[in-house]
Structure formats: structure tokens, C-alpha cells
Amino acid sequence: MLIEQFICREDNFGVLIHDETSGYTAAIDAPESNAIQNALKRRNWTLQTIFLTHHHHDHVEALAELKQIYKAIVIGPEAEKEKISHIDQTLKPDESFLFGTHTILALSTPGHTLGALSYYFPQENLLFAGDTLFSLGCGRLFEGTPAQMLNSLKKLRQLPDETLLYCGHEYTKSNALFALTLDPYNQKLQQRAEDVFLLRAKNAMTLPVTLGQEKKNNPFLRWDNRTLRKTLRMEKETDEEVFAEIRKRKDNF
């Protein structure tokens, strides 16, 4: 499977996936029509499907135009169908389905929104997490609770280390600066942050990244880490309380 990733709007990631066997192409979300059209032209692909991670406008804004041009089928979370115009098919939480020759699991990952989905390709070890999980960060809790988001991140943390993470926004530099305030002596985090700063200085993208790296560096996947808990002075608190405190600090960072 081929993947084309690009920046659109200001900091959204656009992502196209292409099954070489069937010739099918899908977009993960629809943030900006022109950027997606240009990416399709670069690769000489035609859009058949759009997979939506959640209903926020910066992920669905281009639906009407892309449907009109390509007659693409829009597939998204059943729990958010009333909030998404132009949706054609819905997916139940944790439903599996085929894209060309590839199996996809539509993992239910509520927190950022209540119906948010993350698309996992188990054979290829690919994860498209939308705004649930970012490199060195996670999504704000616009609709869900800390408990819901923590459970979603626990689900994603169980995926194999070699899984490649793609997400909805290029937030890695600001996330790295925050992560270093909580985990300043983490050498792997220091190295990742240095790499990120160099990439962003060149206006280069910081994704994809492996989940294995994120498990070592991302504070939102390290709620049970002793060193991090000690820094927070929360050595005996529950996982949910620790996660909620990290999220609160990031909201105010």
C-alpha cells in the first residue's frame, strides 16, 4: 500500500492511501479540497473513498466538493452521522472491513469527540488516529471525559511497537516542548525533540513515527511511568487522575 501525506489548511495533515492491487484510493478525512486534489494529481490517483475520523469542521470541510468531483463514498462513525453532512456509510465501534485487499479495524477511540474512530491496518501495522493521538500529545477533550480518552489511549498503546502512527495535525514541536517540562531527563525524548526541532526548522513533517517511540516519549502514553508520576507528585493516584492532570497542564501550557 502506498501513502501520500501532506500539509493542508495551516497544520492539518492530509493523507491518501492507495491499494496497488485494486487501484483504490482513499483519503483519511477531508480537510482541504485543493490540497487533496493536488496530491491526487501528483500521484495520478482517483479518489474512491473518504474515511472520516470525527465530525470537526477542519476534518470534513472538503466533503461536498470532493464528492461532487470524484463521486467518492464517505464513510464515518455511526455515532456522529447526525453531525456529518454527505456521509454515505457508517461504521460501528471496532467494526472491521476491507479496503481493496487490506483489512481495516475502525477502533472506537472516544475522548476528543464521543464517536471518534482510529483506523488500524493490522497486516501493514498502520494507524491513522485522527485527533485522538498525536506525536508526543493527544487531542483535547472537547466532548469526552478523561476516563474515556484514557481508555482509548490504552487501546492504542496495546498495538505493536512497529505500528506507524499518522495523525490529524502537525503539533509535534509544541508537544515536544510540553513533554520536556514533565520528563526533562528522558534521553529518548530529548533526542526526539531535537529531531523534531530540526525537521520543523526545514518545514519538514515530523510524521509518521512508530508507536514504540511514542510509548517511550509521549507523556499521554506514560501515565503509569514512575519517573513521570514522581515529577507530578502523583505516585499513588489512579491512572485516570494522572492522565487528567497531564491533560490539564497541556491545556494551560
Swiss-Prot record:
Extract the GO molecular function terms from the UniProt entry: hydroxyacylglutathione hydrolase activity; metal ion binding
For Zn(2+) 1, which residues are the binding ones? 54, 56, 112, 131
Question: What does the note accompanying the cofactor annotation read?
Answer: Binds 2 Zn(2+) ions per subunit.
Keyword Metal-binding on entry = yes
Q: Please state the Enzyme Commission number of this protein.
A: 3.1.2.6
In terms of Pfam families, this protein maps to: HAGH_C, Lactamase_B
Q: Which cofactor does it need?
A: Zn(2+)
Q: What is this protein's function per UniProt?
A: Thiolesterase that catalyzes the hydrolysis of S-D-lactoyl-glutathione to form glutathione and D-lactic acid.
**Family membership noted in the UniProt record:** Belongs to the metallo-beta-lactamase superfamily. Glyoxalase II family.
Subunit comment for this entry? Monomer.
- For this entry, the protein name equals Hydroxyacylglutathione hydrolase
Q: Which organism is it from?
A: Bartonella henselae (strain ATCC 49882 / DSM 28221 / CCUG 30454 / Houston 1) (Rochalimaea henselae)
